[in-house]
Amino acid sequence: VYDFRTNSRITASGAYIFGKQGLISFDYTFRDYTNMAFSGGNFNDINQNFEREYRNTNAINIGTEWRFDRLSVRGGYLYEENPNTVAAKGGTNNDDNTQGYSLGLGYDFGSILVDLSYRNTERQDFESMYRPGDVAINSNACRFSGTIRINL
């Protein structure tokens, strides 16, 4: 039997609301991956890998939404540093960090709301929990979604 302590995280958020027209929001998150640890057994080597091969990271999310009568328009940006120190040393032009954006539209027909959204995220991962940097994976993920809400 063992226990695993995950990374610690501190988040600060803020938003400014422009009456009923719109808003701008901002989130900042600091994560400490070096304090991850197994306990309850002989995990010294693994815990030293966490301390040596992972780092503190920063992440930001910025978003906005505006209303024009029944139409709502949204947009956002995200950036998160890769916690892997091997990736941080080996990446170029911050390609080892996660970046992305999102866009959305919604229209309120009264008793029916239609919403469409798009999200794009790019990152380069260096996979392997215990030996970071073994495998590099470039990914570009796009997601479209749609929602129809009916008020009865």
Question: PLM features: residue spans?
Answer:
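Outer-membrane beta-barrel porins/channels
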Residues: V1-L152
